[in-house]
């Protein structure tokens, strides 16, 4: 009766698990040795137990040399990897440069076409597209210019309104100042006696006698200030001055 098929799963019993590991490890190392001898192959085997213990087999001169050989074939080695990365960067930069160069040339060609140059190589569709682009640019330019003009007009109207308000304020202050000066002058004239006197107060004759120059305080109902002669006194003085002294 043959052996049954062993189910591949983790052995729960610790002792059985260690025994199985030792047996299979030795068998694996034996198979690696046989393969290297029978087939003249360079074989390297590395095993770590669950406790971290290392078991290895190498048919070559050393495990390090075999690992370097493996890394060289798998990843190209450290130097080769760096060189490949540099080559990739150079190729990527070159591709980016070519894209930018083609874009610059396209923009320069479009600029010349917009200026009316190098139009001979363009077809009808390209010329129509160029015409539409120019019309769109003109509409945008005119719209922007109109907006700037409207903004300037609005600013000028705002400044005009501000100047009108300032002018009204100055006019109002000037009128108030003139009115205040008029009141001051009238008040000063009243205090100094320069206000206009009535004709009866000027030509009133004193009831008592006098020499024509001095009058009694009771002569007038209100005290007034009189400077110089009255018209009658001026006439009497002139007549007296021209009369001879021998006349009575």
Swiss-Prot record:
Gene3D superfamilies: Transcription factor, MADS-box. GO terms for biological process: cell differentiation; flower development; positive regulation of transcription by RNA polymerase II; regulation of transcription by RNA polymerase II. InterPro entries: MADS-box/MEF2_TF (IPR050142), MEF2-like_N (IPR033896), TF_Kbox (IPR002487), TF_MADSbox (IPR002100), TF_MADSbox_sf (IPR036879). It is found in: Nucleus. Keywords: Developmental protein, Differentiation, DNA-binding, Flowering, Nucleus, Transcription, Transcription regulation. PROSITE patterns: K_BOX (PS51297), MADS_BOX_1 (PS00350), MADS_BOX_2 (PS50066). One of its GO terms (molecular function) is DNA-binding transcription factor activity, RNA polymerase II-specific. One of its GO terms (cellular component) is nucleus. Residues 1-61 form the MADS-box domain. Residues 90-180 form the K-box domain. The keyword Zinc does not apply. It comes from the Eukaryota. Coiled coil: none annotated. May interact with the K-box of MADS6 and MADS16. May interact with MADS13 and MADS18. Binds to FCA. Probable transcription factor. May be involved in the control of flowering time. This is MADS-box transcription factor 8. It comes from Oryza sativa subsp. japonica.
């Amino acid at each position: 009766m043959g052996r049954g098929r062993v189910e591949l799963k983790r052995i729960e019993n610790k002792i059985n698990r260690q025994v199985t590991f030792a047996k299979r490890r030795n068998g694996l190392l034996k198979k690696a040795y046989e393969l290297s001898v029978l087939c003249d192959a360079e074989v390297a085997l590395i095993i770590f137990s669950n406790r971290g213990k290392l078991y290895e087999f190498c048919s070559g001169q050393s495990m390090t040399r075999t690992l370097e050989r493996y890394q060289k074939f798998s990843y190209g080695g450290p130097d080769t990897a760096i060189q490949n990365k540099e080559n990739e960067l150079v190729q990527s930069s070159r591709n980016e440069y070519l894209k930018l160069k083609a874009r610059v040339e396209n923009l320069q060609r479009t600029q010349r076409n917009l200026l009316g140059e190098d139009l001979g190589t363009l077809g009808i569709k390209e010329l129509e597209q160029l015409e539409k682009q120019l019309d769109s640019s003109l509409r945008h330019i005119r719209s922007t210019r109109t907006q700037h003009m409207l903004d300037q007009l609005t600013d000028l109207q705002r400044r005009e309104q501000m100047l009108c308000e300032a002018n009204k304020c100055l006019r109002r202050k000037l009128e108030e100042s003139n009115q205040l000066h008029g009141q001051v002058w009238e008040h000063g004239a009243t205090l100094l006696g320069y206000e206009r006197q009535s004709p009866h107060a000027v030509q009133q004759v004193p009831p008592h006698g006098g020499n024509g120059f001095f009058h009694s305080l009771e002569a007038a109902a209100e005290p007034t200030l009189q400077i110089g002669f009255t018209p009658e006194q001026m006439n009497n003085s002139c007549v007296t001055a021209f009369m001879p002294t021998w006349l009575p």
